Amino acid sequence: IDFLELELLKLEKMGFKYKILKRYKSENGRTNLVDLRTYPSRLTALPDKIEARPYPGLNIDNLPFFAVIATQARGTTLIHDWVYEGRAVHYKELDKLRAETLLADPHRIYITGPTKLKAAEVVCPPALRPAAIILIAMLGAEGVSVLRNIYSINRGYEDIIERLNALGAKI
């Protein structure tokens, strides 16, 4: 939880409702963990851009997940992914699921929501986090989606299909 506090703060400002149920240490005793309960929430786009910063700022690995979250927030969200050259280009893949995006340049994308995502067949982007956000968006899309070339996801997330199915996904 120590490295997600800023992300949770941004989500709270967007209207995300959750409750911390339990705080505890990881098995090795070095990391603080929590169990969360989430509640249905009406999200609103933040007035400021969402961008990663060095610690204690928003973690660069978590920034792409705000792109799929922005598809469900009322208003327009600016995601500024300045660290990785051209990674924001991969966020345009959300359009195949009927997201409403506008790529300003290879680092900045505007996402307008809320959007009712629809099933589609998509080839997985080669970058891990953009591939993961397509998978997450597909889980929230109406209908049955097909995600091809999932090597990057399998490489980066151990047993992801089993873990998501345990949470109620149908993959």
Regions found by a protein language model. Give the residues of each.
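Short, structured segments at the rim of ligand-binding sites
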Residues: 1-171
